[in-house]
A protein has these predicted regions:
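Short beta-strand-centered aromatic/proline hotspots
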Residues: 25-33, 136-144
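Short aromatic-glycine-enriched beta-strand elements
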Residues: 37-41, 148-153
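Residue-level signal for tight coil/turn positions that link beta-strands
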Residues: 35-36, 146-147, 170
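N-terminal beta-strand/beta-hairpin edge segment
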Residues: 30-47
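Short conserved catalytic/interaction loops centered on acidic-Pro-aromatic/His motifs
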Residues: 137-140, 150-153, 161
């Protein structure tokens, strides 16, 4: 996988990224950078829009594929999004450049760099992996950082009065994303219904 990722970075290829245990579900995006354990991807949604930055744990990935018919179709959809002006509605490319500058000045992993960015700027992130039950995904914000874990406040869209908080070890996180449609939607919910918890 490391070689496939290196090739995708070098050629700026659009790729399909499959996580272990999911044969049919995959993410689409541009591989930006990798370190020993993690890879940073600029995600693209089915409408051809940039949909946040995602850090994947490489050990959780099954395969990375480029040059499929689906990706050729996606390239056309991305071209339309660029032409019509909705490719990068959240200024993801600007954020990515800032994140890369920080990453180049630090000894932290890509995962910790993304988590620190989210924590210091009070940004909602989405985390998934082996948290509580395998495959669970949580959107919320980091309450506090510790050496081996974070205290994470997540949003339960079905019970807005709840204020669930869980401790998540860095080792449990297989995927972390922010600056996406989902995280911006969750931010709007937090600001509307729990403004005292946030900022």
């Amino acid at each position: 996988i490391r070689d496939d990722l290196a090739k995708a970075i070098k050629n700026t290829n659009l790729v399909e990224i499959y996580s272990k245990g999911t044969n049919e579900q995959f993410s689409v995006g541009y591989v930006i950078q990798q370190d020993e354990k993690f890879v940073l991807v600029q995600a693209v949604n089915v409408d051809g829009e940039l949909d946040g930055l995602v850090v994947f744990r490489k050990a959780s990935l099954a395969r990375v594929i480029s040059d499929t018919d689906y990706l050729k179709s996606m390239a056309t959809i991305i071209a339309l999004a660029k032409q019509r002006g909705y490719y990068d509605v959240w200024n993801t490319e600007r954020l990515m450049n800032k994140l890369l500058k920080k990453q180049n000045k630090t000894k932290h992993s890509l995962l910790k760099t993304l988590l620190k960015q989210a924590f210091h700027h009070d940004q909602v992130i989405q985390l998934s992996g082996r948290i509580k039950k395998h495959g669970d995904s949580y959107a919320g914000f980091i309450h506090s950082e510790h050496k081996k874990y974070i205290e994470f406040n997540y949003v339960d869209m079905f019970d807005l009065a709840k204020r669930p908080q869980i401790a998540i070890r860095y080792a449990e996180i297989d995927e972390a994303s922010f600056h996406s449609f989902e995280t911006f939607n969750t931010t709007a919910v937090i600001e509307s219904f729990m403004p005292g918890d946030f900022h």
